[in-house]
Amino acid sequence: MNDIQGYQNGPIETGASRAKEMSPRAYNLVMSALIFLGFSAMGVGAYFTSTMSFARMMMSGAALPLVFGSFILTIVGMVMMSAAASKQSVGLSLVGYVIFASTFGLTASFGLANYDLPTINTAFIATAAITFVFGALGVTFPKFFQRVYGIGFGILLATILVEIVLMFMGVSQTITDLIVIVVFAGFIGYDTYVATTVPPTLPNAVLMASNLFVDIINVFLRILNILGRRD
């Protein structure tokens, strides 16, 4: 079985592609640019949520529809990107990513106002290092990450349930943060490898970038949580 055949049950088009294939360099540049766009959206969202006008919206309850709408639109964007990768539709994939990146970035930015700039910078550097290391490991040891992917997903669900219980008990969740970091670091390795096995088309680059963006953001936010408790 070749590398691509292992993912034929997913949304990626592995047969005749409707979208034009790019060079590997262009494919990687597009993914990097899209991930950067996602972080930029998060930065804009962090600025917006730190303003007094947003604070007044939160106090009045007017921001709740915005939060709920962002969550719904994030799901809509993900569905659009998955459908676009299946159909190899360039336009649908780009629209889906714009919706996903802007709304998910806004939602993820809500907690940034609780941290100072040095803490955010430290978390960003640590996240970049983890992304580089596990991305390289994912390409070097793909079979390992394929084997542990399902296990990691199960651990993630169990950890989230434990966190809900600990939240009501008022117990520190540093250990669960570390577990989630390890799990999503593994996802970075897995998704990086998958990105190298699919046809290098724009719709595939968009979907792969969104997967990696979610992985990276979760690592980043969990590191922020840990560093914030130490301040």
Predicted regions and their residues:
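A hydrophobic alpha-helical transmembrane-helix feature that marks the membrane cores
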Residues: 1-231
